[in-house]
Amino acid sequence: MASTAPIGVFDSGLGGISVAREIRRDMPNEHVLYFGDSANAPYGTKSPEQVRELSDVIVKRFVEQGVKAVVIACNTATSAAANELRDTYDIPIIGMEPALKVACDRGHGKRQRVIVAATPLTLRERKFAVLMDRFKADHTIFPEPCPGLVEIVEHGQLDDHDVVMRTLHQYFDQYDLSTIDSVVLGCTHFVFYRDYFRELLPDTAAIIDGNEGTVRHLGVVLESLGKLAPEDAEGSIDLANSDTSARIAQLAQSLLDR
């Protein structure tokens, strides 16, 4: 596989565009093929079997397009399908996971109180339970399923301040937020809500997502294989979606340009 081959990035819908943007920032010479499965969004309320089947169809298409690696820019699909995809395809498959370690390490040994905002399926899967087990003895962790946030992005309502804040309050008013050290955004859609979370949370609370760490890992893997794009290559992002409507195409481009 040539170093100039593209990187496949996919998500249940439009959230993974936040990861594609991170690749563009950190690895500007790379050619990214982005596929959003908005016709089947959200994944977070589906069964693991459904998510595995949908993910396999997408990765198979990427392989046919000659990608050198695939980034599962979806915490839910990572939880449900990453291991099976790695067993099936002979290319690097890079997944996401909630950046819980980053949040806990902020305390430098002091007990941290952390909310993990994610989809219901991400929080139900064994992968998250294993992650929780690593940290729950020394930290207080609150898993918070937030199914409605994916739909707001997919429906193009991200700029509707009242709708977004009303939805966030539904999930987070149960907490004394003044006691929270960090909120982990455990879904790539949620990264687009960072400014809203900043409005909701006290200044002392950190907002953490896994995009930066995932893209850093992608770079390390490609470098180890000698597959980083040459420095004179012109990077690009091609957007595709299972929902071929003009509305989704315009929304995807607006999120990429955001």
UniProtKB/Swiss-Prot annotation:
Any Gene Ontology biological process: regulation of cell shape
Keywords: Cell shape, Cell wall biogenesis/degradation, Isomerase, Peptidoglycan synthesis
Catalysed conversion reaction: L-glutamate = D-glutamate
Alphabetized PROSITE patterns for the sequence: ASP_GLU_RACEMASE_1
Signal peptide start and end residues: none
Catalytic machinery residues: 74, 187
A molecular-function term among this protein's GO annotations: glutamate racemase activity
Keyword Cell wall biogenesis/degradation in record: yes
Positions that bind substrate: 11-12, 43-44, 75-76, 188-189
Pathway it works in: Cell wall biogenesis; peptidoglycan biosynthesis
Entry EC number(s): 5.1.1.3
The UniProt record lists the keyword GTP-binding: no
Pfam family, one: Asp_Glu_race
Annotated PANTHER family: GLUTAMATE RACEMASE
NCBIfam families named in the record: glut_race
Protein task: Provides the (R)-glutamate required for cell wall biosynthesis.
Protein family membership: Belongs to the aspartate/glutamate racemases family.
Name the record gives this protein: Glutamate racemase
Species per Swiss-Prot/TrEMBL record: Bifidobacterium adolescentis (strain ATCC 15703 / DSM 20083 / NCTC 11814 / E194a)
The encoding gene: murI
